[in-house]
Amino acid sequence: MILPILGGPTGSGKTSLTQVLDPKRFEIVSFDSRQVYRDLPVGTTAPTPEECSTIRHWLIGFLNANESINANQFSLLARNAIADIQSRGKIPFLLGGTGFYLRAFLLGMYPVPTVPKETKDYVFTLPLEEARSQLLAKDPKAMESLSDQDGYRIKRALEVVLTGVLWSDVSKETVGGFWKDNPEVKIVGHWLDWPREILYQRINTRVETIIRGMLEETKEVLSKYGPDCPGLRTLGYNFALAFLNGMIDSNTFIEQLAQSHRNYAKRQITWFKKESFLSPISYDAAVQLYTNIEQR
């Protein structure tokens, strides 16, 4: 069984590439932790209804902004989607920018305990330096496997430690994993690689096109669910909230939003470079490769 996978940083053209795939052969399984929200399609740059009508997308826009999902739940949904696609003789095409979700799906997850919402909320508010300091104090060995600047994983480890379980204990071995359960699968995995200057130009241009719609959807979500809902915690919406609250002007909003997307792209690239099942590929080469891939 062939399993095509394409990762890439924000702004790299992942969605546009899906538009050249044959919808009679492929369906897209999205691995994007931000595009799960139906209320926030603009700020998360989710595929448009027109793009989704060209080729079917799974795991896009299925949560309200007041709902949340974790990597384990996402992995189960992805398994179901892949089984459905294969049952109809099509090829599931895994696509997205959330490397953690992709890795968890393929290789499994650490058997971590359930973390109370209050603990998650507390850790979320901590500056990275404070979270790192607390983790070092409570579980020094945990930091041996974590980058000092990996805010997501540091805070995730701290959440677990605050439940009374050492991250250094539970992170020794993963359980589950689609690839581990199906070793016959042959992954054809790449991530879209652009010269950094061109990628940043693409990101800056994209930000200018989404700000109006992003502000409108932020207002709507605010009126429905309030400022603390999970959807508004995703990338960039803190700047939209700051602008709507009069804390920053429009120029600052645009500058900070663009910078946050560029920083996010840099983190995504760092993650993808570390994955042994993915290798860099240019956009044109990816089109050539994936449009001609054959299922076996």
Swiss-Prot record:
Residues that hold substrate according to the record: T10, G11, S12, G13, K14, T15
Any Pfam family hit: IPPT
EC numbers: 2.5.1.75
Keywords: ATP-binding, Magnesium, Nucleotide-binding, Transferase, tRNA processing
GO MF annotation list: ATP binding; tRNA dimethylallyltransferase activity
GO biological process: tRNA modification
Residues annotated as site: Interaction with substrate tRNA: T98
Cofactor dependence: Mg(2+)
Catalytic activity: adenosine(37) in tRNA + dimethylallyl diphosphate = N(6)-dimethylallyladenosine(37) in tRNA + diphosphate
Region of interest (Interaction with substrate tRNA), residue spans: 32-35
Binding site for ATP: G8, P9, T10, G11, S12, G13, K14, T15
Signal peptide start and end residues: none
NCBIfam families assigned to the protein according to its UniProt record, in alphabetical order: miaA
Oligomeric form and interacting partners: Monomer.
Family named by the database record: Belongs to the IPP transferase family.
Protein role: Catalyzes the transfer of a dimethylallyl group onto the adenine at position 37 in tRNAs that read codons beginning with uridine, leading to the formation of N6-(dimethylallyl)adenosine (i(6)A).
Protein's recorded name: tRNA dimethylallyltransferase
Organism annotation: Leptospira biflexa serovar Patoc (strain Patoc 1 / ATCC 23582 / Paris)
